[in-house]
UniProtKB/Swiss-Prot annotation:
The keyword Cytoplasm applies. This is Segregation and condensation protein B. Homodimer. Homodimerization may be required to stabilize the binding of ScpA to the Smc head domains. Component of a cohesin-like complex composed of ScpA, ScpB and the Smc homodimer, in which ScpA and ScpB bind to the head domain of Smc. The presence of the three proteins is required for the association of the complex with DNA. The lineage of its organism: Bacteria, Bacillati, Bacillota, Bacilli, Bacillales. It comes from Staphylococcus aureus (strain NCTC 8325 / PS 47). It is found in: Cytoplasm.
Length: 180
């Protein structure tokens, strides 16, 4: 793979946070001038690399904005991914907890799943008991979608496997009748 492909892969993986110039120079093992030239020569049909201060971010070109808006609208109607379901379960059973708590439990970055859950209104970030970081908690919409009146109504491991299966089946179909 050439340096353009590696750079694109790194920035894609970093997501919205991008990568600091120093990180890129170290990972790519090149000079600042080489990095600047690499970025200037980067060409993609729908993507571009933008610099914000000392951070580089892979972004979409402005010409694609109307299509991206349509996709976002459609995606907001889509079901939850496996990762989002896992994160939602972790939050529901352990709330309040921080993003770093979720990462400790899952051993993987969960920012994308958390952002999805917040965008869908199933989770919100709040300052709880003067904690330094925001804590994630489920919302009333979460209760409504899953047909429970309070968080204590979540099935526990002592309950029937059938009841647990029914709950998670409802979770998979979370955009159903309960959310119109």
């Amino acid at each position: 793979m050439d340096n353009h492909g590696i750079l694109e892969s790194l920035l894609f993986t970093a997501g919205d946070e991008g990568l600091d110039e120093k990180q890129l120079l170290e990972i790519l093992d090149m000079s600042k001038d080489q990095l600047v030239e690499l970025i200037e020569n980067y060409s993609s049909h729908g993507l571009m690399i933008q610099r914000f201060g000392m951070t580089y971010v892979l972004t979409t070109k402005k010409e694609a904005a109307t299509y991206i808006e349509q996709l976002i609208e459609q995606k907001s109607q889509m079901k939850l991914s496996q990762a989002a379901m896992e994160v939602l379960s972790i939050i529901a059973y352990n709330q309040p907890l921080s993003r770093s708590d979720i990462e400790l439990i899952r051993s993987i970055n969960s920012d994308g799943a958390v952002k999805t859950l917040i965008a869908k209104g199933l989770v919100e970030a709040k300052v709880v008991n003067e904690q330094r970081s925001q804590q994630l908690i489920t919302t009333d919409l979460f209760l409504n979608v899953f047909g429970i009146s309070n968080i204590e109504d979540l099935p526990t491991t002592e309950e029937d496997d059938e009841e647990m299966d029914a709950f998670f089946s409802n979770l998979v179909n979370q955009k159903g009748e309960n959310n119109d």
